[in-house]
């Protein structure tokens, strides 16, 4: 649930093979009558020649300049390459320089080597600011949810100071709901059944998070959960398609694209569900109801009042859902695939189950039990190391011209990212391409304070770094550990005969392959949890 961190915008987009070249744009007859086809063509070609922004004051090398003399064709090809081949572009760029430029949907961005991570994280003139909103076209109706990324403190502060403090109180809710949700997905069949880890993780974690964010009644409303999970997935896909167009044409395209119209309907329908709940609470409170609600509806309102900062309750809830649903479900889905890929998976499964049983036999699900899941913590961090949420991370906007410590110049107005490659650096991680389950357990035993799943360091930027690191990572870690514990104790898990599926690449995002499958079979758990 990272706010202002592109590694967790997560999330939640279609793979490149699903992105369509926008050549199917249908203009309504009325628009042609008003504007005239010649006028539209003139606008199109003026934009093509004059407005595509490859102009950049930086002298850093440009990795994907595109081909062609006409700006829009060159820009389209560069954006298409960015969407489908960013990992290759980053590798190519780093082979040439420690700082380089990449043509992206929102202009030309600067990508820096990992050694700059701490400096970028702490620099006072580099902030998430407007870049998230620009990436997701927040000025266009249907995408206004993203306007709060990096600009509003209400959400991040609510998560940091209120959600995190409630983790102990929320654990009973998570542990009670998880087995019911898991059983509804994987059933109790004593024979092997093929399932989607991606769909299972999203189903369970979206419902758990909804109960925490909006309370019992609305959190169990299937329409609410459907709207938020659908918006989560479709908004990123729609933004990817929209970003293939020049910025000046995107508002027009968004008015005509069915996918963008659907986003506007989701926001309208979600507001119709949330507003009555808020109004009912406020009405009851004004008539003496002293009931305390322990959910994000109240946390956001309290934080807004304390800070004197306005917020939109609906858009804030939708942004919370985007961060939480994707971050947690992507991590859980990927770790299931990584575990099944191990040749010694059965041995590792026994070790994980032994740890779960040992941790829970005392007081059950409490903070101590969750902290004692050390091997599981290491497994999750190792999975995130091998498949982070994004190819580049820590997006920052330069509010003025900056000179880094080695003299590298960052022009004012630039968008800067860190290449997310340190987690495969053999100087930091021996056998960097291997999944080693106890890699971080061993480091913890040696006193490495950065070896915890929730720890943020320049060597492992899974949850960001510095003051803008993901504030919801503690909740996400607890949530995933609880669900994974139920899965491992209650089910045998393996790959089907066709084996693993590689992650999908879509722009900056590295996504757990939504087409991947695993096989599950009910087993008798050693203890009741």
Swiss-Prot record:
The chain crosses the membrane at residues 31-51. PROSITE patterns: CYTOCHROME_P450. Its main location: membrane. Pathway: Secondary metabolite biosynthesis; terpenoid biosynthesis. It is a single-pass membrane protein. PANTHER family: CYTOCHROME P450 (PTHR46206), CYTOCHROME P450 MONOOXYGENASE AUSG-RELATED (PTHR46206:SF2). This is Cytochrome P450 monooxygenase ausG. The lineage of its organism: Eukaryota, Fungi, Dikarya, Ascomycota, Pezizomycotina. The gene is ausG.
